[in-house]
Amino acid sequence: MTETNETISRRKQMTTAIIGVGNIGKAVARHLVEGGERVVLAAHDGSKAAALANQLGELASATSVEKAITEADVVLFAVWLDTLKDLIAQHTDLLRGKVVVDPSNPIAQDANGEIARTLPDGQSSGSVVAGLLPAEAHFVKAFGTLGAESLASEANRTPRAVLFYATDDDLAAAAIERLISAAGFDPVKAGGVDAAVRIETSGTLHQFGGLNGKVVDANEASTLMAMAS
């Protein structure tokens, strides 16, 4: 049976694979488990994924990248963009039919350990990643609009902080709205994949871009979206 956005939002149990357990992956995993979602963790260093799963309890487990993708309905790659591109190339067939969540930003550490942009101005990592995925994957750009510290600390505040997302896929939209809500944030769609550049670093809707370090709520996000339309 073909999955629909309605069935995925209503399903009682959904499994999210989180590939990478650095600051972003760890924060998302913790928030999702606290929100009642099941996660399966994988990382280059499997012992770190196993240790985090043990901390998070019965809704979390750890395994290999290949098994995590296979078991999951949703796959979130919490890794640097270059690593993400390699992982897609290695696991293309397994990603068919999966909702793929990309929180990456077009940045990396240079030879001096400084953070530098890795793509030309105006090009988003979201558009790059979407172009590498198989046609059967359901792509969404999300969980990368806040810095790692804010992502970890701003969940479930009052009023709720917003996480923007971008997708052209209804199934991916339903899944990410469920996950963002479970993680303790309000989901707000910025647009299709062509809007990904707005929610990445230096973009108009990114904390370290047009928001000038601010974390916004739904009312503020609505005003920002209206100003941009």
Briefly describe each language-model feature range.
Residues A50, A89, S127, G131:
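Active-site phosphate/pyrophosphate- and oxyanion-stabilizing loops and adjacent acidic/basic residues
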Residues S104-V140, T145-E149, E154:
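Rossmann-fold NAD(P)-binding glycine/threonine-rich loop
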Residues Q55, T63, S124, G131-F139, ...:
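Internal alpha-helical scaffold of NAD(P)-dependent oxidoreductase catalytic cores
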Residues L41, L76, Y165:
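Conserved SAM-binding loop
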Residues M14-T15, V99, V162:
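Residues that mark the start of a beta-strand
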Residues G57-A60, V65-G113:
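Rossmann-like NAD(P)-binding element
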Residues T2-E58:
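NAD(P)+-binding Rossmann beta1-loop-alpha1 motif at the extreme N-terminus of oxidoreductases
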